[in-house]
């Protein structure tokens, strides 16, 4: 009996040694650490953020990251609570697309105190320590939009900006826009009402602007939800002489531009590039590699002629 026991123990020891040797040869650990990263998006309803999220998920899979994605749907209190819940759950890092650039600072500082690295995408945070911000070069995009609108107007006319000034990305867009049209002394920005980046509100605001400024010539819409709301107002009031330049390059806006309506052009962002890049930056940082504080993604501009030459898929 004792002999059989010794033989059994010897066999078990050999099996364990064999497994250890095999593991050493393959270099594959029995369990692989997967980083957990909390993500709070501005919204999941907008095509821009749908593309950004899809690219984040694809890149996270390659980088060995588990993404925990929630959406604030434009609600700062919800976004703050999401960050706090992520911190309580013990995530390795955070990616935030702020609802309000200044308002999110408190949540960022809580993450700093918990020593959880914070990254921002598309919209920057104003306050707290952020490891890396990845976003479109929105100043450049605003310049492209301003130059195009100035060309449409022949260098003169009254313009309104349907604004959303509580987020840094829009602040940058309007700054670039103003830089561009400042070269044209006969173009006058007569109003900058907030439309909150939402179609229905942008439509209502545009209707008010069209009534207030009967000689209005042009509109700069800070995103495509705004542009499409403005377009509906312009068409419903029969003011199709008013031209609109939007921002984002969403599929619906592209279709309207191709239709040949008052929406003439869009500054274009690349949300998939933003989404993939921010996850790559998180992975590098978690591996102990240096990352830049800012990664700007260049913008482009599309109009009917360009879309006809290079149709979107």
Question: Language-model features: where?
Answer:
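Bacterial N-terminal signal peptides that target proteins for export
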Residues: 1-7
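Bacterial N-terminal signal peptides
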Residues: 8-17
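A residue-level marker of the well-folded mature domains of exported/periplasmic proteins
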Residues: 19-313
């Amino acid at each position: 009996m004792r002999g059989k026991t010794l033989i059994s123990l010897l066999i078990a020891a050999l099996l364990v040694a064999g497994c250890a040797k095999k593991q050493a040869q393959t270099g594959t650990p029995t369990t692989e650490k997967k980083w957990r990263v909390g993500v709070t998006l501005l919204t999941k309803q907008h095509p821009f953020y749908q593309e950004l999220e899809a690219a984040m998920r694809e890149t996270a899979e390659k980088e060995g990251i588990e993404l925990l994605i929630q959406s604030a749907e434009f609600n700062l209190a919800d976004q703050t609570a999401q960050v706090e819940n992520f911190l309580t759950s013990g995530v390795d890092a955070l990616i935030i697309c702020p609802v309000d650039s200044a308002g999110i600072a408190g949540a960022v500082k809580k993450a700093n105190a918990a020593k959880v690295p914070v990254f921002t995408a598309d919209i920057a945070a104003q306050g707290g320590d952020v490891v890396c911000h990845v976003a479109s070069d929105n100043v450049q995009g605003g310049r492209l939009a301003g130059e195009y609108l100035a060309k449409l107007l022949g260098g003169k006319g009254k313009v309104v900006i349907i604004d959303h000034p509580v987020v840094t990305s829009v602040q940058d867009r309007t700054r670039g826009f103003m830089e561009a049209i400042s070269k044209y002394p006969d173009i006058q920005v007569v109003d900058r009402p907030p439309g909150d980046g939402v179609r229905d509100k942008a439509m209502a605001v545009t209707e008010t602007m069209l009534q207030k400024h009967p000689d209005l010539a042009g509109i700069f819409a800070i995103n495509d939800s705004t542009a499409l709301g403005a377009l509906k107002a312009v068409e419903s009031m029969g003011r199709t002489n008013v031209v609109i330049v939007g921002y984002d390059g969403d599929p619906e806006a592209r279709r309207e531009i191709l239709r040949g309506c008052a929406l003439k052009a869009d500054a274009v962002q690349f949300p998939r590039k933003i989404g993939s890049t921010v996850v790559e930056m998180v992975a590098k940082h978690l591996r102990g590699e240096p990352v830049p504080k800012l990664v700007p993604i260049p913008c482009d501009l599309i109009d009917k002629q360009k879309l006809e030459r290079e149709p979107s898929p």
